Amino acid sequence: MDINASLIVQMLVFVVFIGLTMKFIWPPLTKALEARRKNIADGLAAAEEGRKELELAEIKSKEQLTEAKTQAAHIIEQANQRANHIVEEAKNKAREEGAHLIQLAKNEIEQEYNAAKTELLKQISTIAVAGAQKILQREVDKASNDRLVDELVSEI
């Protein structure tokens, strides 16, 4: 194998090329590759952190939803209890008012009954007095007495 000057020059040029490449081209290239690797690693870490935050948010939202359902059920139960209480109060008040009205009606009926009874007694007294006057004005015999009593009874 013949080594000639052109092969040596080519080897020297190649070594210079490698040296220049290692000094000027390789460092920015490795920096760019390192920056890209770091950027990808940061992106993956951010994605993992985002996934964890999403899981935590889902858990928290489920807990809040469960708590909201519990509170809603509690509020509905309280509303039902309050409604039942109001209905019972209204029923009791209606019963009391009904009993009061019945008592007032009974009292009024009793007063009307007593007034009618008093009026009837007055009328009977008036008729009895009128009948007694007629009997005393006429001659007293059995037939006229029976006839006057029948008239009085028919008037009553």
Swiss-Prot record:
It comes from Coxiella burnetii (strain Dugway 5J108-111). Its main location: membrane. It is found in: Cell inner membrane. It holds the Pfam family ATP-synt_B. The keyword Transmembrane applies. This is ATP synthase subunit b. Gene3D superfamilies: F1F0 ATP synthase subunit B, membrane domain. F-type ATPases have 2 components, F(1) - the catalytic core - and F(0) - the membrane proton channel. F(1) has five subunits: alpha(3), beta(3), gamma(1), delta(1), epsilon(1). F(0) has three main subunits: a(1), b(2) and c(10-14). The alpha and beta chains form an alternating ring which encloses part of the gamma chain. F(1) is attached to F(0) by a central stalk formed by the gamma and epsilon chains, while a peripheral stalk is formed by the delta and b chains. GO terms for molecular function: proton-transporting ATP synthase activity, rotational mechanism; proton-transporting ATPase activity, rotational mechanism. It is a single-pass membrane protein. Keywords: ATP synthesis, Cell inner membrane, Cell membrane, CF(0), Hydrogen ion transport, Ion transport, Membrane, Transmembrane, Transmembrane helix, Transport. Belongs to the ATPase B chain family. It comes from the Bacteria. The gene is atpF. The keyword Cell membrane applies. One of its GO terms (cellular component) is plasma membrane.
